[in-house]
Amino acid sequence: MDQTTPQLRCSVGVTAYNEEANIGRLLDALLSQQLHVVDISEIIVVASGCTDNTIPIVESFVAREPRVRLFVQPKREGKTAAVNVFLSNAVEDICVLESGDTIPHPDAVEHMVRMFADPAV
C-alpha cells in the first residue's frame, strides 16, 4: 500500500455477558491485530447485565488504551440491544462485531475489512 492510499478505518464492537474468563485475552487480541490497510479507530465493549469481573477487566483496558470504550447495561437486555448500543456509538461507517467469548485470528479484522477498499463493495 503506497502512502497516497487511505487507511480503511473501522469500529470494533464486543458484546459481553459474564466474560471475565475471556474478555482480557479478546481485547489483547484485538489490540495486537496485524493491520496493513485497516485501522481500528475504537473498540467498544457493551457489557450487558454482567455479574462477574467483566466490567473491571474492561475498565483496566479503558484506563490504559484510549481506543477502548465501555458501555454498561446494568440489566441484561440481550445481544440485539447490545449490538444497537455499539452501532449507535460507533464513529466509523465500517463496523466489525465480535462476541465476548471469541479470540480472533491475528489478522481477522484486516481480512474482514480490507474488501471495503474495492469501490464495488
Task: Please name every model-derived segment.
Residues L8-S11, E42:
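Cell-envelope/extracellular polymer assembly enzymes that use nucleotide-activated donors
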